């Protein structure tokens, strides 16, 4: 996770406080976890029932590095667990890796990778369960995207538009026409897209910064995505507060 993404992620905590949904592991996740960590026990069903929904028991088990080794030992193991479980384990591994480093590589707005001595800041961030859970859930949401066609009536005329929940412009347009009470969820999705693209594909986004942009161009730079993500996280939280 590039440290500059911290400017976007700083608004996640507020959002997660408002929309704190139960992010639970499913039965297959728990079985894989128990089989991997509790190797000296045979009463796996009992342990699964014991640790279910118990964060204080699950947390140390999720820290076991053996989970990473076993997950990638066989491809079949990757489909045994949910994307949310997989990304939770991966984020914990990233945190362990960063504990041994003084810097992380940051992609600047020209596409150049430079060392930034903020590894500790990222480590501390991933040490906060509420942030880590949000990131795991957000990353999992991009393993399967949705698209479709929507029809709506505006100013006496019917309109038709195809939408994808991986496209910022689509989500902005959809937020404009849906009921106000549904907008915070779409604002969150817009912010998630910005965070995902700027954090996972910064090299791709910075290509746009080096190109000449006409005043009609809809291309966004890395900086644009960062600013947009931060703004929509903030708006989502504010509008949700007002609707309460």
Model segments located where?
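Polar/charged low-complexity regulatory segments
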Residues: 2-244
């Amino acid at each position: 996770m590039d440290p500059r993404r911290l400017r976007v992620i700083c608004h996640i905590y507020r959002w997660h406080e408002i929309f704190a949904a139960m992010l639970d592991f499913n039965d297959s996740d728990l079985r894989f976890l128990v089989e991997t960590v509790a190797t000296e026990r045979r009463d796996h069903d009992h342990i699964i029932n014991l640790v279910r929904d118990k964060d204080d028991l699950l947390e140390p088990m999720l820290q076991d590095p053996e989970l990473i080794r076993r997950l990638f030992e066989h491809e079949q193991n990757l489909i045994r667990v949910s994307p949310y479980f997989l990304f939770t384990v991966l984020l914990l591994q990233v945190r362990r890796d960063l504990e041994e480093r003084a810097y992380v590589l940051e992609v600047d707005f020209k596409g150049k990778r430079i060392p930034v001595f903020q590894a500790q800041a990222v480590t501390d961030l991933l040490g906060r369960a509420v942030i880590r859970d949000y990131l795991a859930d957000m990353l999992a949401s991009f393993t399967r995207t949705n698209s479709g066609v929507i029809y709506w009536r505006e100013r006496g005329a019917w309109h038709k538009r195809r939408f994808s929940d991986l496209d910022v412009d689509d989500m902005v347009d959809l937020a404009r026409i849906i009921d106000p009470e549904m907008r915070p969820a779409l604002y969150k999705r817009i912010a998630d897209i910005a965070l995902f693209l700027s954090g996972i594909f910064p090299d791709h986004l910075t290509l746009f910064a080096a190109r000449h942009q006409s005043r009609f161009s809809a291309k966004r730079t890395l900086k644009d995505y960062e600013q947009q993500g931060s703004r929509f996280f903030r708006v989502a939280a504010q509008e949700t507060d007002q609707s309460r």
